[in-house]
């Protein structure tokens, strides 16, 4: 059996066994929590959703949504600027040193478009499979960490690292950082 086909079947079965929920902020009262508002209509695997209630006066709920809705509508997005100039930082403006890791694996700024597409593809797949970890939550939203793997360009083997994302309503995840560490 073709390995790619086998992996696709395995992933489909894994996803069909998951329960997904949509976070709903109930608009009651005059005051609203910024964290709750930022989660409104965001989708999570039930077992990896933020704890509800978030606080003593929380009126939020989670509602089950069909796996098919998630599978058909989820999307991973990233801005090209997260790779060039941010990741490779050719002018040393950001001074984060993230470019050193990618350069040590054989990647250059000319690989930015490929990295963008590959990280989006893997980010979406891992999100759909529930392979993410919750990060910080505040009024800007819920962050998640997703591990991706790319081939080394300057040798054999692969390298795996953490990417950072923000969960947005309707099944969208948006890249915050293409490299959040090993």
Which residues does each predicted region cover?
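Domain-core detector
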Residues: 1-57, 63-126
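Functional cores of ribonucleases/endoribonucleases
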Residues: 17-28, 32-34, 116-182
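C-terminal edge-of-domain segments
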Residues: 50-65, 160-174
């Amino acid at each position: 059996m073709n390995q790619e086909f086998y992996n696709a079947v395995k992933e489909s079965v894994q996803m069909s066994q998951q329960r997904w929920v949509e976070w709903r902020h109930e608009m009651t009262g005059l005051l609203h929590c910024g964290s709750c508002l930022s989660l409104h209509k965001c989708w999570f695997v039930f077992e990896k959703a933020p704890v509800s209630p978030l606080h003593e006066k929380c009126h939020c709920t989670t509602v089950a949504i069909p796996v098919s809705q998630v599978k058909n509508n989820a999307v991973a997005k990233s801005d090209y600027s997260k790779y060039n100039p941010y990741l490779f930082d050719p002018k040393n403006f950001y001074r984060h040193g993230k470019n050193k890791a990618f350069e040590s694996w054989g990647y250059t700024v000319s690989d930015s478009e490929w990295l963008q597409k590959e990280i989006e593809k893997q980010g979406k797949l891992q999100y759909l499979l529930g392979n993410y970890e919750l990060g910080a939550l505040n009024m800007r939203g819920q962050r998640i960490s997703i591990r991706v793997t790319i081939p080394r360009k300057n040798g054999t083997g692969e390298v795996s690292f953490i990417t950072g994302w923000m969960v947005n309503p309707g099944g969208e995840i948006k890249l915050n950082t293409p490299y959040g560490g090993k």
